[in-house]
Amino acid sequence: MRLVILDNYDLASEWAAKYICNRIIQFRPGQDRYFTLGLPTGSTPLGCYKKLIEYHKNGDLSFKYVKTFNMDEYVGLPRNHPESYHSYMWNNFFKHIDIDPNNAHILDGNATDLQAECDAFEKKIKEAGGIDLFVGGIGPDGHIAFNEPGSSLVSRTRLKTLAMDTILANAKYFDGDLSKVPTMALTVGVGTVMDAREVMILITGAHKAFALYKAIEEGVNHMWTVSAFQQHPRTIFVCDEDATLELRVKTVKYFKGLMHVHNKLVDPLYSMKEGN
């Protein structure tokens, strides 16, 4: 497990974007060899997406041979609703890059048979060869995707009832009106994300500091689903200084002492431009 600590949100976002960029380019994707990327929504990854868009517009990165699988989607919210994750991904990322829309997979929260939709999503991931890099974020209660506290740590893509903490947190996106906030969602399982060859989890802000503490300094616990990734062979937690406030001083000191190693993963930043 790696813990990468940057001074602030912008630097953490940039480090994460550089890492994704380098992993895609090192993979050398092509017509018969797609890089498969798992993606989150929410406020945390926005800075990372902006940097990836910048790399694309500069000609350094192409998503032509990338397939994406999103973590989750609300149930019952129209696809074109401004707060649907289809809208989020299109407006904040997909419409700014060269990905084929057929290669951008998002769960359909309006499917007639929701369980069949979940099963089909798992099948699509398998047919794509599995996820090369799954990027995630967490909530203050340590949930990843919509795997709320108490979720099975071997769970697969399924229908979930949202915890009240999550509904309250999401109310800001629905004019503060709890009655408008979806109470159910389709989500990949903890096991689905654990199956990825590599996982990178973005954690920023003091309000997520206790969750980061639970994620890496205490044992694996289904009440803090993000803690499951202690047992993944290739997990990177990328955080800002504020998110480390609940960690032991020696933990922070240890991982900061490794930053010269971690920075070699993103420096130099590779490019798809000819000659780079």
From Swiss-Prot:
Pathway: Nucleotide-sugar biosynthesis; UDP-N-acetyl-alpha-D-glucosamine biosynthesis; alpha-D-glucosamine 6-phosphate from D-fructose 6-phosphate: step 1/1
Regulation: Allosterically activated by N-acetylglucosamine-6-phosphate (GlcNAc6P).
Keyword hit for Coiled coil: yes
Keywords in alphabetical order: Carbohydrate metabolism, Coiled coil, Cytoplasm, Hydrolase, Isomerase, Phosphoprotein
PROSITE patterns: GLC_GALNAC_ISOMERASE
Active-site positions on this chain: D72 (proton acceptor), D141 (for ring-opening step), H143 (proton acceptor), E148 (for ring-opening step)
Places the protein is found: Cytoplasm
PTM-bearing positions, type Phosphothreonine: T161
InterPro entries for this protein: Glc/Gal-6P_isomerase, Glucosamine6P_isomerase, Glucosamine6P_isomerase_CS, NagB/RpiA_transferase-like
GO cellular component: cytoplasm
Domain of life: Eukaryota
Span of the signal peptide: none
Main location: cytoplasm
GO biological process, one term: glucosamine catabolic process
Record's function text: Catalyzes the reversible conversion of alpha-D-glucosamine 6-phosphate (GlcN-6P) into beta-D-fructose 6-phosphate (Fru-6P) and ammonium ion, a regulatory reaction step in de novo uridine diphosphate-N-acetyl-alpha-D-glucosamine (UDP-GlcNAc) biosynthesis via hexosamine pathway. Deamination is coupled to aldo-keto isomerization mediating the metabolic flux from UDP-GlcNAc toward Fru-6P. At high ammonium level can drive amination and isomerization of Fru-6P toward hexosamines and UDP-GlcNAc synthesis.
Quaternary assembly: Homohexamer.
Matching PANTHER family: GLUCOSAMINE-6-PHOSPHATE ISOMERASE, GLUCOSAMINE-6-PHOSPHATE ISOMERASE 2
Protein name: Glucosamine-6-phosphate deaminase 2
